[in-house]
């Protein structure tokens, strides 16, 4: 693509992202049934917490273990397309490790928080493990929110040469502005791994949990597949703009 097209496309898409995130956060704190509206200041804590969680995961993966710090199957799928299938075996193994890491982490958290878990409704355990939408039957909207959020996150990955930790601020912005409808997975491992652990915990400790609820794997397809679709789209987009 030539410089003029890049400049004009940059203004178009950059302004789109600006308004989506800017007015998105306004919608989140104003509309009834938006999670940010319902939980108030706690939503800011959640957004900051997830941003810092990404920061810590990236630093440990890159600086301590000398890894790649994808930490997200959608990111790995993006690189799979961007690199035209190079090292595809390694990339699939990375996705498996991401899912396994998420599951082990949730087991550790459940063990640490067990006394709190059994003195609260099981819905609290599920809500702190995996995502759920404000309107479950709004499939198109839920898929769209997860895809859009992941696509913006992957735009941050595409800007990785600017700074390796750009994604931290992208995550915070996405959760604040676009997370109030679906709970904002934007990472299949982050949702599916802990969802499986919630399901197994509810089965194994059914008599100890208060009012167990379904793991809802049917809805779980949304945070599993929508980010993967976003990875495919953004991988293709990266090839297009770098021709």
Swiss-Prot record:
Gene3D superfamilies: Glycerol uptake facilitator protein (1.20.1080.10). A motif (NPA 1) lies at residues 72-74. It catalyses: glycerol(in) = glycerol(out). One of its GO terms (molecular function) is glycerol channel activity. Aquaporins contain two tandem repeats each containing three membrane-spanning domains and a pore-forming loop with the signature motif Asn-Pro-Ala (NPA). Belongs to the MIP/aquaporin (TC 1.A.8) family. PANTHER family: AQUAPORIN OR AQUAGLYCEROPORIN RELATED (PTHR43829), AQUAPORIN-9 (PTHR43829:SF9). This is Probable glycerol uptake facilitator protein. The lineage of its organism: Bacteria, Bacillati, Mycoplasmatota, Mycoplasmoidales, Mycoplasmoidaceae. The gene is glpF.
């Amino acid at each position: 693509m030539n410089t003029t097209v890049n400049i004009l496309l940059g203004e178009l898409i950059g302004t789109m992202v600006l308004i989506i995130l800017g007015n998105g956060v306004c919608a989140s704190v104003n509309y009834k049934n938006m999670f940010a509206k319902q939980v108030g200041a706690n939503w800011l804590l959640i957004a900051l917490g997830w941003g810092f969680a990404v920061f810590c995961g990236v630093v440990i993966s890159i600086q301590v273990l000398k890894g790649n710090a994808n930490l997200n199957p959608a990111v790995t799928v993006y690189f799979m397309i961007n690199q035209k299938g190079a090292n595809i075996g390694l990339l699939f193994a990375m996705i498996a490790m991401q899912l396994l890491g998420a599951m082990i982490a949730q087991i550790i958290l459940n063990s640490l928080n067990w006394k709190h878990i059994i003195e609260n409704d099981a819905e609290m355990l599920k809500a702190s493990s995996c995502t759920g939408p404000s309107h479950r039957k709004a499939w198109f909207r839920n898929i769209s929110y997860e895809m859009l959020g992941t696509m913006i996150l992957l735009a941050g990955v595409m800007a990785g040469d600017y700074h390796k930790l750009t994604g931290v601020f992208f995550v915070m912005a996405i959760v604040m502005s676009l997370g109030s409808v679906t709970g904002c997975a934007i990472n299949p491992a982050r949702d599916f791994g802990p969802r499986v652990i919630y399901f197994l915990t509810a089965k194994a400790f059914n008599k100890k949990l208060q009012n167990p609820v379904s793991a809802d794997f049917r809805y779980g397809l949304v945070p599993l597949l929508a980010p993967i679709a976003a990875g495919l789209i953004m991988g293709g987009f990266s090839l297009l703009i770098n021709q």
